[in-house]
Amino acid sequence: SVARGALLTFNGEVEKKLARGLNLSAEAEVRMKEMTNFRPGVNHLKLIEVGTKLSYKICDYVKVGGGYFYRAYLKDGKESTGWENYWEHRHIVVVEAVASYKVSNWKFSLRVRPELTIRTDSICELEKVRNFAELRTRLQVEYDFASKPFEIFAYTEMFNTLNAIDPNETLNEVYRLNWEKNPGYSVPWSGQYVNNVRAAVGFSYRFDKRNSIKVYYRFDYDIGRDIHLNKNYANNFKEFTVTRENEFSHMLGIGYAYSF
């Protein structure tokens, strides 16, 4: 496992009530690189994300919605970019359902969110999925101090792949491209898997009916699977490796929300 330094992220949200139970929101996020690596004069952006979401409250216990997000990652330079930093772009489509239940000042909720991430960069589709689907499941608890404009919350979230590449199928294709006989070797890390586990704790403060802020700490444990094909000459893959790339990171988040 690889430990990453603390990250800093800023969130903003504007929400408009269109009709009874129907809301439209616009969201933005800016995430910085590890604070431990801060150096003056260096671009510390990690990603920028903007999007919009439409939600509808069916009843007191159930809300559904969907939206679109655009995400841009700032990557370190490589030889093909002249060692200049460059952007990678993603288009993300989400749908979600949230079930919630209140007990006194406590509120418990479960959110299920299928998510499709569309890549725009050049990739080898034997190594990576261009249109990557995953299922996010979040369990959250909140406590509202009724006499004060203050709320604390905690949640845990799990990400499951829905269409990850099966390394064994890739392996078969590699042997076919090499005109070799498949010796029956199988990769132990195949099929769908949990690729991220997330937990957070924080608080929110309401200035008035329209304005609020939140501050939170988040822990991420990423469970990656890297498929790599070594090319000895054009279109002839000779070596095939599958490795796990596990890493965890800490994040401090600050958010602002406005509703009207």
PLM ranges: what are they?
Residues 1-67:
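Start-of-domain marker
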Residues 97, 246-260:
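Outer-membrane beta-barrel "beta-signal"
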Residues 35, 43, 72-92, 112-121, ...:
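Surface-exposed acidic loop/strand-edge motifs in secreted or periplasmic proteins
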Residues 39-103:
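Hydrophobic/aromatic-rich structural module bridging two neighboring secondary-structure elements via a short loop
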Residues 18-26, 60-62, 91, 104-112, ...:
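Outer-envelope beta-barrel architecture signal
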Residues 107, 111-234, 258-260:
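Outer-membrane beta-barrel transmembrane domain signature
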Residues 10-12, 50-52, 95-97, 137-139, ...:
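Membrane-embedded beta-strands of outer-membrane beta-barrel proteins
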